[in-house]
Design a protein with these regions (language model features):
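Extended serine/threonine-enriched, polar tracts that run as long, contiguous segments within proteins
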Residues: 153-241
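Accessory, usually C-terminal, subdomains that scaffold auxiliary metal cofactors
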Residues: 215, 219-290
């Protein structure tokens, strides 16, 4: 078996594994400190005293961007933002409503460069249950499968840094500081939003330009549902008038995003491996175990 035979203090992760340090890690995994960017579809209401009466008021409007920062456990809002996209990935996800003692959960796949391949998910399956390949006749599928596919969302995952314009807190109070260059992840899963957010990347691809060299301004547009409710989609504007410099700090942030995706994919793959074997028939599981035994004997 190949092992690292030279001590490299600049590569802690690889050396720690070789030196048997991995087993000393705390079993309680640290939560991701990457801020989450979303669109806030519903207004946040507050109360104010007007002429001696307490009245309900809208303190944060619907259609604002919401940034959840786990480091401080705070959430910030802004009607307009500017993002510097470093990279994008693609995945599938499906919400599963809990019943009884079973909690709500998301079935999620690994992240990939495209959706043109089968993606392992955290339940031991592929594509969150969506059949592999192109579906020529959706209506010919069994009704249960049609319903399952309707629940599965394509997700465009954006990694970058964000500037919030005139940010507020959840009470609608203006912040006394700027919120700039904050690393974030944005899972874009609404169909129209998926398309809109992808347009700047398509434009840059045609021009053979890298997304990290430009900014994208983001606001929102309102949409109406048949029942009268509203939701919002991103309104994005790619700014190619300024080419942003790439210094060592940008390189470090980019590497941290790549590491984040690697760690996420390793976790999903580990879940897939555990549950895929458990989902096999007893005969298939025995066959897998036999292969593992043979492989182990050869290795030793």
């Amino acid at each position: 078996m190949n092992q690292v035979a030279t001590i490299d203090t600049a590569n802690y992760e690889a050396m720690a594994k070789v030196m048997g340090m991995v087993g000393e890690q705390n079993s309680d995994k640290a939560k991701s400190t990457l801020a989450r960017l979303r669109i806030n579809h519903s207004a946040i209401m507050g109360t104010a005293e007007i002429k001696g009466k307490s009245m309900n008021l809208e303190v944060v409007g619907g259609g604002t961007y919401r940034l959840e920062v786990p480091d401080t456990d705070e959430t910030y809002y802004a009607s307009s933002i500017s993002i510097r996209p470093y990279m994008q990935r693609f995945m599938y996800k499906r919400f599963v409503k809990g019943r009884g003692t079973i909690k709500n959960m998301f079935v999620k796949t690994v992240m990939a460069d495209s959706l043109n391949v089968d993606l392992k998910d955290n339940t031991g399956g592929l594509n969150c249950g969506k059949p592999a390949g192109y579906i020529e006749d959706f209506k010919a599928l069994p009704e249960d499968m049609q319903n399952l596919i309707r629940q599965i969302k394509r997700v465009r995952v954006i990694f970058g840094t964000v500037n919030l314009t005139n940010p507020t807190n959840a009470n609608g109070d203006a912040l006394n500081r700027e919120m700039n260059e904050i690393p974030f992840i944005w899972e874009v899963d609404q169909r129209e939003a998926f398309k809109h957010v992808g347009e700047p990347f398509q434009a840059l691809l045609k021009q053979r330009r890298l997304p990290v060299q430009y900014r994208i301004g983001c606001e929102t547009d309102e949409r109406k549902l048949p029942n009268g409710n509203t939701y919002y989609v991103p309104n994005v504007n790619l700014d190619t008038t300024e080419v942003l410099p790439i210094g060592e700090d940008i390189q470090d942030t980019f590497r941290s995003f790549v590491d984040w995706v690697t760690n996420y994919n390793e976790y999903i793959t580990s879940e897939w491996e555990d549950k895929h074997v458990n989902n096999l028939s007893s005969e298939d599981a025995s066959l897998v175990e036999e292969f593992i035994t043979v492989d182990t004997s050869v290795e030793n």
